C-alpha cells in the first residue's frame, strides 16, 4: 500500500544520500578484504587506508555532483514533505561533502605518519556524513533523530578509532556518554512535541502551533528539551563541557571533522527545527536561545585564552563559533540562514586548513600539539606558518588576511542588525568576543613568528596531498575573502529557492509578525 | 599631459594594488641578506629583498606624484575617482578617489615609507623578504585608508594595516615586544570591530544598497543612532591615533618597533579618519555639546599631558612618541573646533607630525644602529662628533616644537587661531602645551648633543653616511619648504575643508543647534 | 492511563538524568542513558494511543538506535577497560586542560 | 487491550506464585547442615584457585553486540513480513487479493535494500573474523 | 480462571511425565529397561524425584550474590511457564458463553509473545552461572547466553517466511492459513529445518547442550544447584522443549489442523471437533518431543566453535537468503496469477526441492551430512595436516616461542581467551 509515495520520488529525493552510503559500504567491503594485523600482507594493508581515503574523496566529489544536479533540476523532497528538497538542504549537503572530503585528506595525511587508522575509517567518515546529509534534509523529527544518530554513532567510533591510544579511548567514552545523554534529551523533546501536536512532521507542528491560542506547557517543555539536546550537539555553553576533552583526545583529522562538519550538520538541523518548525513559538524560545548564544560566545572565548594546548584552544574556539552561529539562528530570517551557510563554508575551510597544519607539526605523535610545538614554525616552514596565520585570522574574522572569515562575521552581523527585531546587543557581544578571541589566536601567531624554535624540535614535513589541502584552503579563503559574492550567491539561493513542499503556512519573515499576537 | 594618458583612471587602483603584488614578488624573489652573511646557505638568486622593496616603494611614490599631478586644485568633489564593481549584493564598490584632505596624506605616506626604509637600511637585516613584503602590505593598507570612499573597502584597508604592523613590531622589534604588539592589536581591534557594527548599522539605515560615503552622507539618522555610531567610529579612530586616554599602547609599541614600523605607527591615520568619516557622517553627534566638549577637553589634556610626560622621559624614542601624542591632541582640537582654519591646521599638523616624527624616529634609529640604545643617559655631546646628525636633529626638533619657519608652526598656528576664535580658554591652555613642547624638545637636544662627551664609545661614532644624509636632507628640506610655503597643501585642503564644514552644517544630520562657526573669514 | 504512563516515563527519565549527573561509572552512565531512551519510548507509546501509529514507528527506530548505541557503548567501555583497567570516569585523566 | 492480555497477567501471577511457593516450601522442608568442605564451589574435587569472576573471553561480548544488532534487524523484518502482501500491491487489496496488474515491487525493493545493507555488515563481521570462535 | 488452572496442571504433569518418558526412551534406544522401581513400570518415578528434590539439602556456596542465586531458578522457570500460554491447542470450543479459543491467552501477537518471553529465559541461566561463583557455572552461563542469543536470530529469521505467507503474527491465523494452503513444512521446508535446528539450540538440548556439557563443565550453569532449585531449571528445560515442539507443530505442521479436510476449520464448531483437533495437535507435538529425545540419544555433541559457526555463518545467511527467495517467489507467483492455495504450496515445494538440492551439493560439501573423515581425499588430508601445523606454529608464535611473533588478531578486540 505504498500510497502516493512512488518509489521513484523517494529515490529521486534521496539519491545523494543513497549514493554516499552505497559508496561507503563498498569502501567498507573493500576495507574488509584488506589484510591487517597478523595476516600476511598487512604491510600493504596500511597503504590501503590511504587508497580508500582517496576513493572516499572521489566519492564525495561524485555525490557533490549529484547534489549540484539535483539542485539544478529543482528536485523536490519526498511528496509527504518529510524530506526537504530545498536549497538549504542542497547547500548544506555541499558544505558537508566539502568538509568530508577535506577531512578524508587530513586522515590520509595523518595516516601517513602514524598509521593509526584501520582501513574502515574512511567509510566510517562517509557514513557519518550520510547521517549529516539526512540531517540537512530532515523535515520530520524522526528523520532528525535518525540523522543525528547515524552521524553520532559513526563519530563516536571515529573518536576512539586509534586503538593504541588511551587518549583516544577516553575521548570516545566521554563523547559517547555525553552524546547518548544528549540524544535522550533530544528524543524526550521530540516525544513531548509529538504528544502535544500529534505529528512529527515539522510542517504539521507549525500548523498546529499556529492554530493555537496559547501553547500548551507540554509543547513548551518539548521545545525546551529539544533545545537542550541540540545545544549539547552543537556544543553550546553550558552544555559544552565535553568538547575540550573529546577534541583533545580524538585523532586530529577526526577532531577537524567533528569541529567543522559535524557542527555544520548540527547547526543545519538546529536552524531548520527552530526557524522552520518552531518559528511560531519564537517568542517563547527566543530569550533562551539569546542567552545561550551570548553565554556561549563569552565562555568559549574566555576559556580559550588560557589554553596552551592548541587542540583544546581550537575546541574552545569552536564553542565560541557555535555562539556566533547561534546568533544567525536567533535572527531566523533568510538573511540569517544564508549567513549561517556562508559562515560554515568559511569555518570548514579554516578548520580543515588549521588541522592540516597541526597534523603536519604533530608528526604523528599521540598527543595534542601545544604552543611549544608550533613555536618558531616560521623559521623552518615559513609558508606553513603563513597559511596557519591565514586560518587563525579567518577564525578571528580579520578582513583581507583572514579572508572569508571577515565576511562570515559581516553577514551574521548584517543579519543581526537587519532583522525585523535587530539584535544589536548580540552583535556587540559578538564583536567584543571576537576581539577577545584575537588574544589567543594571535598568541599562536606570535608563537609561530616571534618565538625561537625550541631545541631538538624536528622540522615538520608534509605529504603532497596535505600540502595541497592547506594551500587550497588558504587560497580559497583569501580569494573568497576579497570576492565573497559566489559563495554568498550560493547561500542566498539556498535560502530563497524553496521546494514545492516547503511549508506554505510559515513563510520566513512573516512568521514573526504572526506570532507577535500570540499571548505569552 | 598626465591626464591625456588617462592616468587618473588607473593611478589610484594601481596605488592600492601595486604594493600587494610587489609584496608577493618580494617575498618570493627577494634574497635574504642575513643568510648570505651567516654563510649558512648558498645565496639564493635574486636581488636583495630590501632593494626590491625600496624599488617597489619608489614606484608607489611615483604614482603618488602622478596623483598630485592630476589633482585639480580648483576642482570640487572627488578627483581621480574610479569605481570598480565589487560586491553587488552589499552595494559595495571599490570606489577610490582623493580630495584635498586625503591628497596630502597619500603623498606623505608614499614618500615617508620609502624614506624611512632607506633611512633605516641596516635596522633590519634578518628575513628581509618577509619584512619587505609586510611593509608593502602595510603601505597598501595605509594608502587604502586614505583613498577608499567605500566604507567596506575602507574597513578592509583599515584592518589590513593591523596584522603587518603586528608582525613588524613583534618579529623585528626589540626582544620581548610581542606583548606590546599584541596589546596594540587588541586595543585597535576592539575599537575597529565596534566600528564594524556601526558601519553595518549605518549601511542598513541607508537602505542596505550602498556603502559609498556619498550615499551614506545623505542618510538621515536619529540622534540616538548617530550618537552610538559616532562613538563606535570614534572609539576605533581614537584608539588607532592614540588619543589620551587610549594612548598607552603607543609609546611601548613605538619604542620597541623597528624604525620603519615606528614611523608608520606615527602616521596619524586615525585623525584623518575622524575628519573624513566620524565627523561628517554623524555631525549632530560630533557637534553635540557634551560629546564635543568632552573631546575638546580630552584633546587639550592630550596636548598638555603629552608634552609633560615627554619631558619626563629618559629615552629618546619615548619622547618622540609622547610628542606625537601631544600633537594628536592639537589635531583633534582642530578637527572638532571645525573652523576652516582649524581644519586646515589639523591637516597641516597631520602632515607636519608625519614628517617630523619620521625624521626623529629615523634619527633615533640611527643612534640605535650605532649604540644599540636610545636612552639619554648613554649620550651627550654628539654635536661635535656628529655634525650632520645634529643639524638634522635640531631642525626636526624645532619643527616638532613649532618654531616659525618650519612646517610644524603652520599647523599649530592655524589650529590655535581657529580654536581661539571659538574657545579662547582652550586655546590658551593648548598654547601652554606648545611651551612645554619647547621644553622637552630643547631638553632632548641638549641631552643628546650639547653636554660633555662622557662616554668613550660616543667619541668615535661615525657621522651620517651618504644614504642617511640623503634621507635626512630630503626630510629637513620638506619641513622647511612647507614651513615657508605651506600654500602647496593649504591651497588643496581649502576646498575640502570648506566642503567638510558645509556638509556638517547643511547635511541631513546637521546639528539642530549649530556650533558658532563663522564661515566667512 | 496515558497520564500514568507519562508520569512513569517522566520519572524514569528523571532517574536516568539524576544517575547521569551523580554517577561516575561508565557502565552505569551508559545504562542511565539507555534508561532515558527507553523512558522516552514509553512516552511515545503512550502518545501513540492518542495520535496513531507514528509513535510506534518512532519507538522501533529508537530501539534500533538504542541497540546500535548499546553495541557501540559496550565496545567503547571495553576499550576503556583495556587501557585504564577501570571504568570509573573520574580515574580517566589523560585529557586535562 | 487489557482484556486480551488479562489471561497472560493472571498466568504470570500464578506462575510467580508457584515459583515462590516451590522455593519457599523447599526452603522450609530442608535443614541446611553446611560444612566448610560442602560450601566450597565444586570444581571436580580440586580446591578452587581464585575467584570465578575473572575476565573471560571478549568473544562473549562480541556475540552480545552482534546479537543486539542483528536481532533488531529481525524486529524490522517482522512488520515487513506481515505487511508484505499489502506492500506488494499498488492499490488497496480486495478481499485479500491484489487486483490483477497492480502488483508493486515496492515492498520487495525496500527489503532488498535493507538486506543488502545487512549483508554488507554481515560480510564485514565475517571477514573480520568475529564469527569464528578460536 | 479455570482454563489456566487446568492447562497449567496438565502442563506440569506432562513435564513430569516427560522426564520419565525421556529416560524410558533413552533406555529403549540403548536397549535397557530404564526406571522401573517406583510404581508399575516406573510410572511413579517423577513423583519420587519430586519428593526427593523437596527433601534434599541445598548447598550454599560462598557466593557474593545470594539473592541472585535464589532468584535465578525462578527467572528460568517463569518465562518457560509463560510461553506456551498463547499456543492454540485446538479448534475453538463452543460453550454456553460463546466460542472459546483453545489457548490460555489468545493474544493477537502470539508469535511475538513467544519470541519475547522465551528469550527472557537466558537471564536465569546467566545469573545462575554468575551468582554461583563457580568457574564451570560461569562458563556454562556465558556459553548458554551466547548460544541462545546466536540462535535466536536464526530462529527469528527462519520464521519470517511464515509471516510472509500468513500475513499475521497471530498463531491462530497462521494455523488458518495452513489449513487453506497446506502445511508450511511443504512450502517452507528450509525455514522449517532452520527453525528446528535453532529450536534445539534454544532449548539447550543435545546436540547443542554445550552450556551443561557434563564432559567439560560438570553440569554447566546449575553445577552448584541442588534440590528444588535444580529442579526448577529442569522443569524449565522440559517445558521449553514442549513449547518449542508445539510451536513447530503450529507454525509448520498446521497446528491443530487436520490435513486434507476443511471440516475442522469451518463453523459450526463442536466439542467433537475440538477434541479431535486437540488430539491431532497433541500427536504432532508429541512427535516433535519424540524427535527431540531421539536426537538427544543419537547425535554427538557439537564443539563450541562449531556450534557458533553453524549459527552465525550457516544458519543466519541461509535464513536470510531464504527470506529473500520466498519474498521473490511469492511475489512472482502472485504475478503469475497463482492464487493462495494448494497450487501455491506445490509451486513453493518444487522450489524448495531445488533449493535443498542446491544447499546439499553446493553449500554442504560434506560438512553437514557425512562425517568429514569419510570424505577426506588424500590431497585434502595433506592440506588439513599443513593447516594444523600452521595453527600450532602460530600458537607457538603467540606464546613467544617462535621469533616471528605476530600481533593479536586485529580488527576485532581480542583479549584473553579460554
UniProtKB/Swiss-Prot annotation, chain A:
Q: Where is this region: Disordered?
A: 494-520
Q: Which cystines does this chain contain?
A: none
Q: Does the keyword Cell membrane apply?
A: yes
Q: Where are the transmembrane segments?
A: 13-33, 55-75, 87-107, 115-135, 141-161, 176-196, 219-239, 250-270, 285-305, 313-333, 339-359, 383-403, 425-445, 468-488
Q: Which major enzyme category is it?
A: translocase
Which GO terms are recorded in the biological process aspect for this UniProt protein? Answer: ATP synthesis coupled electron transport
Keywords, in A-Z order? Cell inner membrane, Cell membrane, Membrane, NAD, Quinone, Translocase, Transmembrane, Transmembrane helix, Transport, Ubiquinone
Q: Where does the UniProt entry say this protein principally localizes?
A: membrane
Instruction: Give the reaction(s) catalysed.
Output: a quinone + NADH + 5 H(+)(in) = a quinol + NAD(+) + 4 H(+)(out)
What EC numbers are recorded for this enzyme? 7.1.1.-
Compositionally biased spans, kind Low complexity = 494-508
Q: How does it sit in the membrane?
A: Multi-pass membrane protein
Q: Which GO terms describe its molecular function?
A: NADH dehydrogenase (ubiquinone) activity; NADH:ubiquinone reductase (non-electrogenic) activity; quinone binding
Compartments it resides in: Cell inner membrane
> What GO cellular component entries does it have?
plasma membrane
Lineage, top-rank taxon, reads Bacteria
Q: How does it assemble?
A: NDH-1 is composed of 14 different subunits. Subunits NuoA, H, J, K, L, M, N constitute the membrane sector of the complex.
As for what it does, the entry says:
NDH-1 shuttles electrons from NADH, via FMN and iron-sulfur (Fe-S) centers, to quinones in the respiratory chain. The immediate electron acceptor for the enzyme in this species is believed to be ubiquinone. Couples the redox reaction to proton translocation (for every two electrons transferred, four hydrogen ions are translocated across the cytoplasmic membrane), and thus conserves the redox energy in a proton gradient.
What is the similarity comment for this entry? Belongs to the complex I subunit 2 family.
What this protein is called in its record is NADH-quinone oxidoreductase subunit N
From Swiss-Prot, chain C:
Q: What is its main location?
A: membrane
Q: Where in the cell is it found?
A: Cell inner membrane
- Which superkingdom, per the lineage? Bacteria
UniProt name for this protein: NADH-quinone oxidoreductase subunit K
Q: Which gene encodes it?
A: nuoK
Q: What class of enzyme is it?
A: translocase
Q: How does it sit in the membrane?
A: Multi-pass membrane protein
Q: Name one GO molecular function term.
A: NADH:ubiquinone reductase (non-electrogenic) activity
